[in-house]
Each structure stands twice: as C-alpha cells, then as structure tokens.
C-alpha cells in the first residue's frame, strides 16, 4: 500500500510548506522510493489561469496543459520529473466536479453534502496520484483555521484512518518567532496552532519550525512535550542561502528517522552526492554574469519564479552566478538613448519575459531594439518573441504599423495574430475567436518544435526536435516569414502545424526568441538548454563582444 505524508501550515502563510514538502519528497526519492506530490489550493477559482500575477504569482504550466500553482514547478525542479493536472486541485475544481456529478444524477437523488460527497472527491483525487507510487506527499495550502481549508483537513483525517496509522503521517510547518526586544524565541503560536489541528481531529507527528535563530535543545523538548510528539521529530528550518540547501539541512537533522519510524520504511540512506555538488556551485560559483531581466510584474518577482530558478540552475551548471538586473518595462518607455545606455551599460545579456496586455510593451520594444543594435545577447520568451518580430518589422522591414492583434485588432500589418485553430495537448482540435472566454482557452502544454539545423537554437538543443511548454493565444504570422528572412531574421523552429516557434538573427552574436516557455521544462539537475546557452553566450560576450 502507498504511504501518505500530509503537510499542513500554521500561524501564518508563506512559511515554506512547498519547499518543506519538496525537500522531504526529494530525500525519500534519493532513498530509492518512487515519490509523487499533490498541492491542494483552497481557493474557489477552478485554476490560477485567470488570476493576476500580483494576486497569485506565477502560473506554472504542466506537460499535459494544466495551469497550476507555482509549487508544482518547485516539485518538478526538486524531483526532476514531470507532474500533471492530477497533481494540483482547488476548491473550485472539487465543487465543480461534485456539482456536475449531481446534475448527471450520479448521487441517485441524495442530498449532496460536504461530508461525504466533497470529502470523498478530495480523497479520490489524492488516491489517484498514490496508485502508481510508493509515497505521495500532499501539501495543503492555506493555514490551519482558515474556513476554506476545513473540508480538506477533514478529508485527510478520514484518509489516515482508512489507510492505517503506519501508512499516513502529518507534518506541521509552523513559525517560532524571535522577539528582539525580549531576546526570546516564542513557542505559544505553535502550541495554539497544534491545538487547532487537534480540534479538527489531527495530531501532527512532526513539527518543522521556521525560525531566525537556531532552536535550543530545551525549547525543542518543550515543543515536543506540549505538542505530544517525539523529541527527534522537532525540526528547525532556518533561512538557507538557496532553497536547494533545505533538503541537506533537514538530512543533517536526521529528519528521515522519525519519518521512517512512523511509516515503517526501515533504515534510509539517501545518496545526495550530486545534489550537494550542484548546491555548492549555486552558493560558491567561480564566475559571474549580469543579465537584464525586463518584465512588467516586478512588484511580485514570484510572477517569474520558474525563469529565475532556470537562470540559477544554468549558472550552477556553468559554475557561474547569474546576477539579475531587474528592469521595469514601463520605466524604459520614458528613457531616451542616453538613459538606455546607462541602464544597459553593465549587462551582458537582455531577457524579455512573457506577459499579457499592452502595458509596458513599448518599453520592452526599446530593450529589444537596444539588444539588436548593440549586439547584446538576447533571449525573448513568449511575448518576448512576438515583440522581437514586431520591433524588427517596424525598424528593419519598415512596416511602421506592424503590431499584434492583441494590442490593435485592426492593425494593417498583423505580424502577430490570434491563433484561431490549433491542436491542443490532448490531440483535440480547438477553435478560438477574440470573444472566446479567458479561462483555459490558450494553447497550453507541451508541443513538439522542429528545430532548423545550422541555427543557434539547434546549437543549444543539439537536436532537430524538442518538446517545450506553451501558454499563449497569439502567434507570429507565418505570412511574413519570407520578408523577415530576407532582412536577416530567420524562423529556426516550427510546430507540427507550421506555427512559428522560434526566430533568431543571422548577423548577431546570439539573438534568439521563442514562443514557448523553456523555464517550465527546466530542472535543477537538467537545466533547459536554450536558457543555459543564453547564459553561456552572455558570459562569452562580456569578455569578447
């Protein structure tokens, strides 16, 4: 039978439940177990796809086309695996599924209630993930005591009894605040949080304590005694120089001992040699390179979580620190040539990230033009590719009114236009118009890209076919391909249907733009190749360009 580890959070949010969950899963995976993960989000949205980046942070896209919580990205990067739609679900999805069943008559006229119908649907989804693995780690979003989370806590409480006490474990992530004025660490918030869990019928088997200061032995013993857990199951989680250090910190505290004891796993000895080697490269690299990151959601940098991690991973594998120079695209709109020189003077590469809407677009166009004219290595992603084509069409082809239909539906030169027909990740034909609903209507998930030999994109991938993930409604208009090629911008990647997937400049040290999101396939142990090529060429350029 599969084993279950449920990770809850107390006191307040953003304590690092996702990293804690991923770290535990990683240690178990490196101990030889087949591990998967689930993230439960208690909000009523069906998925985060239509939520503002400022509200939710990044929307992570899986191989099978799900728009998910950014923690799914953390799980994939830690476990070096691909997850999917079944690994993330929300209150909205649960209620929608139950209501659809009720409308079909699946409940045979019964009154539909939280218990058993909602809780049964939650348990069914968790069990579905557990079917093919040894251990599933389930992170429950939110904080204990939130009204939205009660059905989920009840469901996992029931599940524990169904699978038996040696097949389920509860890990509670909590805060031990340090009061500077008193010079003391305080345990009372954690004690109250555990009491709240107990009222629901759950007693945690382990505490993971976020803290600014190391926890004295006496304080750990106090927590263990007051919360009724074993003393070796109080784990401290101090801030680390990188999140990838956290599994190693946990391992140094023998976190697997109480886990193995509770789940009857035997002696565990994870091999973290390769992991430790990469972490050292992240913390103490020999070289450095500065990259300008041009975006429009910089107030919440978690909007670009996967891309930031991809740069870090590429740097680690090149023994290099990637210093990110954050540049708000709206600030560039007001900048003259002298100001642009000042902004980009010390950077060795320019990255223009994806986004939606017209805000900040003119600033991104200025950054792209600067990279093109000054021979600075450039990577454009999603909108960053579309704008690279618009900039080239306006300033090199002389098409003054070249634009995207996203910003000007009536543009006379639609070099970027709405994808009105495509085959989705499940093989189904999809039709779209400007009036189609926003939720779940984009080109989503992994698609094949055929790479043209003799291009920089081919040099990066060393393959003529790759699978990368997409999240977009608009696409470069293939009708302009010949005109672009004649002036030096070539299409270096296309989809099965012939959609433009990548463009690059022939007479430039390294100018590549892609419609897909390479950051979504990036992993700690296997960085995305086009992002790593960008970082590598930016470093080369700072020394020779």
UniProtKB/Swiss-Prot annotation:
Instruction: Extract the NCBIfam families matched here.
Output: PRK05380.1, PyrG
Say yes or no: keyword Metal-binding present: yes
Stated name of the protein: CTP synthase
Upper taxonomic lineage: Bacteria, Pseudomonadati, Campylobacterota, Epsilonproteobacteria, Nautiliales
CC terms in the record's Gene Ontology section: cytosol
The chain positions of domain Glutamine amidotransferase type-1 read: 290-544
Region annotation (Amidoligase domain) maps to: 1-265
Instruction: Please list the residues that bind CTP.
Output: 13, 146-148, 186-191, 222
Does the keyword field hold Ligase? Answer: yes
Q: What does this protein do?
A: Catalyzes the ATP-dependent amination of UTP to CTP with either L-glutamine or ammonia as the source of nitrogen. Regulates intracellular CTP levels through interactions with the four ribonucleotide triphosphates.
Which pathway does it serve? Pyrimidine metabolism; CTP biosynthesis via de novo pathway; CTP from UDP: step 2/2
| Gene name tied to this protein | pyrG
EC id: 6.3.4.2
Q: Which residues bind UTP?
A: 13, 186-191, 222
What positions constitute the catalytic site? 382 (nucleophile), 517, 519
> What HAMAP family does this protein's entry cite?
PyrG (MF_01227)
User: Which residues does Mg(2+) bind?
Assistant: 71, 139
Signal peptide as annotated in the record:
none
Gene Ontology biological process terms, A to Z = 'de novo' CTP biosynthetic process; pyrimidine nucleobase biosynthetic process
Catalytically driven reaction(s): UTP + L-glutamine + ATP + H2O = CTP + L-glutamate + ADP + phosphate + 2 H(+); L-glutamine + H2O = L-glutamate + NH4(+); UTP + NH4(+) + ATP = CTP + ADP + phosphate + 2 H(+)
């Amino acid at each position: 039978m599969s084993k279950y580890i449920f990770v809850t959070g107390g006191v307040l949010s953003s304590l690092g439940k996702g990293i804690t969950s991923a770290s535990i899963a990683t240690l178990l995976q490196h101990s030889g177990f087949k591990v998967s993960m689930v993230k439960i989000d208690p909000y009523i949205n069906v998925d985060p796809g239509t939520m503002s980046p400022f509200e939710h942070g990044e929307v992570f896209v899986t191989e099978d086309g799900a728009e998910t919580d950014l923690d799914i990205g953390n799980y994939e990067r830690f476990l070096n695996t691909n997850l999917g739609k079944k690994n993330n679900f929300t209150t909205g999805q649960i209620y929608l599924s139950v209501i659809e069943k009720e409308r079909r008559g699946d409940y045979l006229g019964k009154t539909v209630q939280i218990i058993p119908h909602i809780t049964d649907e939650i348990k069914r989804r968790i069990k579905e993930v557990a079917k093919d693995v040894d251990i599933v780690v389930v992170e429950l979003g939110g904080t204990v005591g939130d009204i939205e989370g009660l059905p989920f806590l009840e469901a996992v409480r029931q599940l524990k009894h169904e699978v038996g006490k040696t097949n389920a474990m509860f890990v509670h992530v909590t805060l031990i605040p340090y009061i500077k004025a008193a010079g003391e660490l305080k345990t009372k918030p954690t004690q109250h949080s555990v009491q709240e869990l107990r009222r629901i019928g759950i007693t945690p088997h382990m505490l993971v304590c976020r803290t600014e200061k190391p926890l004295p032995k006496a304080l750990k013993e106090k927590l263990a005694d007051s919360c009724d857990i074993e003393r070796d199951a109080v784990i401290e989680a101090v801030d680390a120089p990188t999140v990838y250090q956290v599994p190693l910190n946990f391992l140094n505290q023998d976190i697997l001992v109480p886990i193995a004891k509770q789940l009857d796993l035997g002696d565990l000895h994870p091999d973290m040699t390769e992991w430790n080697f990469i972490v050292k490269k992240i913390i103490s690299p020999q070289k450095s390179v500065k990259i300008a990151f041009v975006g429009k959601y910089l107030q919440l940098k978690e909007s670009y979580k996967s891309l930031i991690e991809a740069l870090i991973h590429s740097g680690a594998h090149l023994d290099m620190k990637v210093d990110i120079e954050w540049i708000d695209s709206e600030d560039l709109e007001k900048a003259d040539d002298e100001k642009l020189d000042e902004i980009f003077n010390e950077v060795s590469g320019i990255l223009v990230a994806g986004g939606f809407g017209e805000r900040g677009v003119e600033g991104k166009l200025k950054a792209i033009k600067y990279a093109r004219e000054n021979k600075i290595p450039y990577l454009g992603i999603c909108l960053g590719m579309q704008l690279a084509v618009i900039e080239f069409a306006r300033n090199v082809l002389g098409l003054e009114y070249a634009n995207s239909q996203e910003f000007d539906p009536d543009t006379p030169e639609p070099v970027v236009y709405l994808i009105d027909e495509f085959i989705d990740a499940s093989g189904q034909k999809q039709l779209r118009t400007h009036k189609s609903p926003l939720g779940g209507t984009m080109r989503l998930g992994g698609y094949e890209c055929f790479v043209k030999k003799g291009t920089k994109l081919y040099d990066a991938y060393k393959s003529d076919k790759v699978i990368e993930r997409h999240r977009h409604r608009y696409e470069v208009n293939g009708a302009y391909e010949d005109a672009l090629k004649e002036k030096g911008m070539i299409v270096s990647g296309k989809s099965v249907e012939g959609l433009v997937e990548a463009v690059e400049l022939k007479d430039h040290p390294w100018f590549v733009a892609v419609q897909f999101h390479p950051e979504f396939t990036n992993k700690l142990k296997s960085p995305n190749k086009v992002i790593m090529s960008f970082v590598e060429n930016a470093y080369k350029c700072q020394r020779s360009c």
